[in-house]
Amino acid sequence: MFDIGWSELLVIGVVALIAIGPKELPGVLRMVGQWMGKARRMASEFQGQFQEAMREAEMADLKKSFDEVKEAASGFSPAGMMSSLQRDVDKALDIEGVDKPAEPVIATSPEPVASVETPVTPTTPEPPHAETFVEAEAHQAVGEPLAIVREIKPEPQPQPADGAAPAEPERLKDAKAS
């Protein structure tokens, strides 16, 4: 504690024996021991109070964080979620604003009105021509990946009894991968 070695303790003992004397030395040592005991008790009491304050502060922090979590979790109760969902559905089903006729709009802006002489250009695009449609399909088909499928080899089929020609077997070549 005070970093006193044996040699220093021996020097202190010899000085105390010479200064105090052998008759009163046991009483003085007892009194010094009591003071040391009181100092240790005070130090341990202070340390205990300090640790208690730290635990209380830590518990207050934990309680605060627990209260925050509890408050946040209270909004997630099934009844609370159902009531919020019910409110959303009620708002979606509210048709009072839909039934009212639209109010007439009065044009107060100083925008120039198109004259009758000005030809109006259509805003919708023309339908695609057959040539452009085929080109568009070909362009789209080039960009898509193809799946590799093996061709089905025709199996020998029995000849019909009436002498008709057999039907052409189906062949699968390239199929679009999708």
UniProtKB/Swiss-Prot annotation:
The chain crosses the membrane at residues 1-21. It is found in: Cell inner membrane. The keyword Oxidoreductase does not apply. GO terms for cellular component: TAT protein transport complex. Residues 146-178 are annotated as: Disordered. It is a single-pass membrane protein. Residues 168-178 have a biased composition (Basic and acidic residues). Keywords: Cell inner membrane, Cell membrane, Membrane, Protein transport, Translocation, Transmembrane, Transmembrane helix, Transport. The keyword Transmembrane helix applies. Its main location: membrane. GO terms for molecular function: protein transmembrane transporter activity. GO terms for biological process: protein transport by the Tat complex. Part of the twin-arginine translocation (Tat) system that transports large folded proteins containing a characteristic twin-arginine motif in their signal peptide across membranes. Together with TatC, TatB is part of a receptor directly interacting with Tat signal peptides. TatB may form an oligomeric binding site that transiently accommodates folded Tat precursor proteins before their translocation. The Tat system comprises two distinct complexes: a TatABC complex, containing multiple copies of TatA, TatB and TatC subunits, and a separate TatA complex, containing only TatA subunits. Substrates initially bind to the TatABC complex, which probably triggers association of the separate TatA complex to form the active translocon. Belongs to the TatB family. This is Sec-independent protein translocase protein TatB.
